[in-house]
C-alpha cells in the first residue's frame, strides 16, 4: 500500500504543478481540469444545472423504447445503466477481443446488500442518501421517488448472481450472436440502444454474456407500469 500511496501523491504533485504553471497546451488542460474539479464553491453554486439536459431526457421517457434510446444517449456520457458492457480478450479465443455483457444497475456493492439482515442499517442510510440526491436535483417528493427507485433496484438485485457464481469462469462464459442476445431481453432493442449510443453494430454482433438469467429477469421489469420507477431510478 505504501507504493500505491506514494504513487498517488506523486501524481497529485504533477497535476498541481500543471495547474500552477503549465508549460504546454496539454499540461494546461490537465491543470484546468484539476482546478475545475477542486473548485467546490463554483460546483455548489451550479447545483444541478449541469445535469439539466440529462434530467430533461429522463423526464421525457414515456415508453420502454424511449427509455432504451435515452439509455443509449446517456451511455455516451458514461452514465451507468442496468447493463454493463466492456471489451476484453475472449477467454475461449485469446487471439481476439470481444464485447462482454454483465449485470449492473446497483448502487450498493452487490445483491446481498438488498436482502441480508446484517445490511439493514446500510440500506436505510442508502435510502436517505438517494432521497438527499433527488432533493438536490429538484425532484418533487424526493422521499416517494427514492422509495420507488430503491424498490425497483431491489427487484433488479433479486436477479443478480452472487459473488461466488460470478467467479465461475465456465458459468459466466456464454458466447452469443446478436439474435440470441435479443431473445433474452425482447423489450430492450439493442439496435435502438446502439444507434443512440453511437456504438457500431459490429460491437454487439457477437458477445459474451456473463449472467444470462439476469437478462431474462431484467426483461420482467421492462414494463410500462414501472416507467415512473425507472425514471426515478435513472435520476
Language-model segments: residues:
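N-terminal mature-domain "stem" immediately C-terminal to a signal peptide or N-terminal signal-anchor/transmembrane
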Residues: 1-15, 167
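Noncatalytic, helix-rich "gating/capping" subdomain that lines the substrate-entry/channel surface
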Residues: 15-235
Amino acid at each position: 500500500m505504501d507504493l500505491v500511496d506514494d504513487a498517488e501523491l506523486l501524481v497529485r504533485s504533477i497535476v498541481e504543478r500543471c495547474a500552477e504553471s503549465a508549460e504546454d497546451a496539454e499540461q494546461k488542460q490537465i491543470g484546468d481540469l484539476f482546478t475545475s474539479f477542486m473548485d467546490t464553491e463554483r460546483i455548489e453554486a451550479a447545483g444541478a444545472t449541469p445535469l439539466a439536459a440529462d434530467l430533461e431526457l429522463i423526464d421525457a421517457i414515456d415508453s420502454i423504447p424511449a427509455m432504451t434510446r435515452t439509455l443509449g444517449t446517456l451511455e455516451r456520457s458514461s452514465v451507468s445503466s442496468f447493463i454493463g458492457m466492456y471489451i476484453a480478450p475472449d477467454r475461449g479465443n485469446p487471439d481476439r477481443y470481444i464485447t462482454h455483457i454483465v449485470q449492473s444497475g446497483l448502487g450498493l456493492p452487490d445483491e446481498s446488500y438488498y436482502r441480508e439482515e446484517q445490511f439493514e442499517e446500510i440500506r436505510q442510510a442508502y435510502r436517505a442518501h438517494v432521497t438527499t440526491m433527488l432533493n438536490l436535483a429538484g425532484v418533487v417528493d424526493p422521499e416517494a421517488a427514492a422509495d420507488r427507485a430503491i424498490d425497483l433496484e431491489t427487484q433488479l438485485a433479486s436477479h443478480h448472481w452472487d459473488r461466488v457464481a460470478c467467479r465461475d469462469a465456465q458459468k459466466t462464459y456464454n458466447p452469443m450472436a446478436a439474435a440470441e442476445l435479443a431473445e433474452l431481453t425482447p423489450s430492450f432493442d439493442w439496435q435502438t440502444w446502439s444507434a443512440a449510443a453511437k456504438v457500431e453494430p459490429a460491437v454487439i454482433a457477437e458477445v459474451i454474456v456473463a449472467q444470462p438469467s439476469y437478462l431474462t429477469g431484467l426483461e420482467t421489469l421492462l414494463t410500462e407500469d414501472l416507467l415512473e420507477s425507472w425514471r426515478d431510478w435513472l435520476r
